[in-house]
Amino acid sequence: MSESFDASAFLKTVTSQPGVYRMYDAGNTVIYVGKAKDLKKRLASYFRSHVASRKTEALVKSIKHIDVTITHTETEALLLEHNYIKLYQPRYNVLLRDDKSYPMIFLSGDAHPRLTVHRGAKHAKGEYFGPFPNGNAVRETLILLQKLFPVRQCENSVYRNRSRPCLQYQIGRCLGPCVSGLVSEEDYRQQVEYVRLFLSGKDQQVLNQLISRMESASRDLRFEDAARIRDQIQAVRRVTEKQFVSGDGEDLDVISVAFDAGMACVYVLFIRQGKVLGSRSYFPKVPGGTELGEVVQTFVGQFYLQGNSGRTLPTEILLDFTLPDKDLLTESLTAVAGRKVQIQTKPRGDRARYLKLARTNAATALVTKLSQQSTIHQRLAALANVLQLPEIHRMECFDISHTMGEQTVASCVVFDANGPLRSEYRRYNISGITPGDDYAAMAQVLQRRYGKALDDSKIPDVIVIDGGKGQLGQAQAVFDSLQVSWDKNKPLLLGVAKGSDRKAGLETLFLEATGEGMALPADSPALHVIQHIRDDSHDHAIGGHRKKRAKVKNTSTLELIEGVGPKRRQTLLKYMGGLQPLMNASIEEIANVPGISHGLAEKIFHALKH
């Protein structure tokens, strides 16, 4: 188990109700999502003296904190767990990339409509469903739809040029409308209608129509057709059965607030098409003496009215608190959405159950947060005592990441009195240095960070340098050379050298670039907060470096051809049906693409061949 995670204290705050839990590492990255019929019993099983597998043992060692979401039923917990896995891609569940966008599913207006992912403006003729929380969610939905309703998903350029059905037809995931005689117009239209109803949340209508068709086929002695429709009914039921949904299938956001010990937790439950898509807890800073109604009012205004184009307004917002200016806020949200948005504070029926669920989760999240904050306060006080400082209000930590000196990225993470201040985490692209020179990289990032005017509240009490005497000496040299108006002597520079075999708990701390360092006991709270900020900085640097490296790696040859911009690339790929067909095309075939001259076609042909 992670040394910085107090399992015993955490388990005291956990309920025995069904729900979903998310486990985080030191970098606040979700590393595992699970569901349980009894959250307390399930989570307690991770912290026994003997765990079930090596995977579980490795997982538990990485845990820094855990969030839980309570649900009505275990089935709902399972569905919510699936949404969270798609959203967070935890490394102990799956390894998928998240596009961090809000894509939609597009059902085209073609004679034989196709299903596809869509992003951006809605210019194409057809129907749009969504938005979905991320790219993985929409792709998983398309795969599911393909299994339930075999509507084509191929590009029009591929569809128009087929003379025989593709593999998707062979495995039963497309009806093959590209080839005459494989499917009737009526049968294909019926499957498209099922897709339309299913994506609109009208699952029962889909089932009713399928049951009617199955009974009709059976009466007409078309038993093979009846069996096929029966299998389709069972597949749809497996997806939709037992989920707790609001009866009308509308889009709702359910917001509840909990307040204790000077801290507020605003919990938002997201419901789309009557289904729970996910939830999130927010902890706004609340000045002393603020009324809870004002907290909710301010939060709702900031949450929906600050120009976040990726966030869509629901049809209805449910609140557990009466707002002072409810009518004004309703009018503002309606104007922004371009349609009626309602705010309800006294719902009934299913809506009341959702609000009760949000209240429970808000209270649970607040208890967990207060417990974590208490631990952070104790650790910072212990570190201040070790460093002989009166107190620590702000810490910053730096780390460098690169691969063989390439794509060097420096990270800066910030802790305040309550722990990680992620809104102030920063990454710096390092350039103009000898590849692999970590000292020069550290000097550059420190100069860029501190060689400018700083507000007093932004001056750190402690600056942690991930490195030994050499890196600390570099940092001290930079600070000696600073020509700034703020007190450059205020921050205490602390070097952290990794122990033998890079094992946690064996770190050596340096306050001076010369002389001996000091080691703290492995169970020292002061060491734990140093490890926490150091690990956060390390993860933040690696994350930035990987993105930078992937960007370079994923730059295709097509992007490097002069005269081929984003629009022409898109036209080429759509017309040819992808990069591989384009690479296999002749000059004449490339020249047939709209907007591509013969001369440019030659240039593209030779660039792709060589």
Curated annotation (Swiss-Prot):
The keyword Transcription regulation does not apply. It is found in: Cytoplasm. The keyword Cytoplasm applies. Residues 16-94 form the GIY-YIG domain. GO terms for cellular component: cytoplasm; excinuclease repair complex. One of its GO terms (molecular function) is excinuclease ABC activity. Residues 204-239 form the UVR domain. Keywords: Cytoplasm, DNA damage, DNA excision, DNA repair, Excision nuclease, SOS response. One of its GO terms (biological process) is SOS response. The UvrABC repair system catalyzes the recognition and processing of DNA lesions. UvrC both incises the 5' and 3' sides of the lesion. The N-terminal half is responsible for the 3' incision and the C-terminal half is responsible for the 5' incision. Belongs to the UvrC family. Interacts with UvrB in an incision complex. This is UvrABC system protein C. It comes from Pectobacterium atrosepticum (strain SCRI 1043 / ATCC BAA-672) (Erwinia carotovora subsp. atroseptica).
